[in-house]
Amino acid sequence: MVLSAADKSNVKAAWGKVGGNAGAYGAEALERMFLSFPTTKTYFPHFDLSHGSAQVKGHGEKVAAALTKAVGHLDDLPGTLSDLSDLHAHKLRVDPVNFKLLSHTLLVTLACHLPNDFTPAVHASLDKFLASVGTVLTSKYR
């Protein structure tokens, strides 16, 4: 999915508002995903998945760091996320549908925390961005 100039601007502005909360929002999105889609827990059998768990917070930080890196390289998502794509496809073997589920819960989390900034246009741009990230992360499954 190609991001327009307006989409790129919206994504950068929205992610800028996330600021230092990126890790916390990432962890919250993971918690939402585990609660809403319990089958996603199967990829984390060694994690304490309880609310506020240090392991979920740590993984939320990793998710947020990857997305922050992607926001900084919107014109080269495949190159930027190549290592993560390899990891998820070949080592972790994560079912691709899980990227869509996490994208959904991340959008919900952002909408809750940034209600005044989460306009329909920003929502659409973030959705396209997260779909693009998901496409890149699943590109090496073939």
From Swiss-Prot:
Residues 2-142 form the Globin domain. O2 binds at residue 59. PANTHER family: HEMOGLOBIN FAMILY MEMBER, HEMOGLOBIN SUBUNIT ALPHA. The gene is HBA. The keyword Iron applies. Belongs to the globin family. Keywords: Acetylation, Heme, Iron, Metal-binding, Oxygen transport, Phosphoprotein, Transport. Heterotetramer of two alpha chains and two beta chains. One of its GO terms (biological process) is hydrogen peroxide catabolic process. Pfam families: Globin. The modification Phosphothreonine is found at residues 109, 135, 138. PROSITE patterns: GLOBIN. InterPro entries: Globin, Globin-like_sf, Globin/Proto, Hemoglobin_a-typ, Hemoglobin_oxygen_transport, Hemoglobin_pi. Involved in oxygen transport from the lung to the various peripheral tissues. Heme b binds at residue 88. It comes from the Eukaryota. This is Hemoglobin subunit alpha. The modification N6-succinyllysine is found at residues 8, 12, 17, 41. GO terms for cellular component: blood microparticle; haptoglobin-hemoglobin complex; hemoglobin complex.
